[in-house]
């Protein structure tokens, strides 16, 4: 199997931009690998602890907290894995408003406090699989998206649930500088079918490791769908709308032959530039202890979600 390089798992234009940024900073290309995440630990203790129902016992080995908060894709804060922790540390998430609108009987707005107290919070230990063929295990805290959907009371026209990330170029340097933010047409947009949104695995997360989400992980609220590639799990959400028509999502618009609408984890459907048959596990060890493991269909959640796609050709609808 081909050994993946950073240029393999990143769209070519964005990788070349990243090289240019790193070079202008006087850093070596080796910086593009697993980052030095010591700086990510500085703010861990400052995050507010949450009250939640603990997860049931899991056999999954958790990825250490400092790696979860120090190795991220959040292009609004830069395309390098270490950039979000560095450039999001002063990101202001309070005050915040999450607008619920569209084809619903009950549109509403949640403020920052209401994100944490409107619905009972619970812990979910989920596998997290990036489309770049690396994975983690994360102890998320949040509530089922289905609870919010039920409160909104979608009409019979609502076929899709559409999410928008905050657009704030003054706080998000990747939105202000196309070179720094991967030339994405912001704000970041994602969407699900209404059936996917109602699945009990679909989580709106407000925390991890017992505390509020760090900014680089999508504070104050993000989507988590453990059977899909990570780019579907949109961060720092300010708007959720219900639509009759399917929108073009951000990565689908950028590279439709590489990043599909459904983005289900599927070891039998390779990315055009690399295999999805296995993944690099980011665990407790250092660089020399990083291991590869076979990728599971739907990331190991086949029993819970396969029925959603029984009438789809997953090689076409990837």
Swiss-Prot record:
Subcellular location: Periplasm
One MF annotation (Gene Ontology) recorded for this entry: oxidoreductase activity, acting on a sulfur group of donors, quinone or similar compound as acceptor
CC cofactor note: Binds 1 Mo-molybdopterin (Mo-MPT) cofactor per subunit.
Signal peptide: 1-40
One GO term of the biological process aspect: protein repair
Identification of the protein by name: Protein-methionine-sulfoxide reductase catalytic subunit MsrP
EC number, as in UniProt: 1.8.5.-
Gene this chain is encoded by: msrP
Keyword Metal-binding applies: yes
Presence of keyword Signal: yes
InterPro entries assigned: MsrP, OxRdtase_Mopterin-bd_dom, OxRdtase_Mopterin-bd_sf
Catalytic activity: L-methionyl-[protein] + a quinone + H2O = L-methionyl-(S)-S-oxide-[protein] + a quinol; L-methionyl-[protein] + a quinone + H2O = L-methionyl-(R)-S-oxide-[protein] + a quinol
Organism: Haemophilus ducreyi (strain 35000HP / ATCC 700724)
Cofactors, names only: Mo-molybdopterin
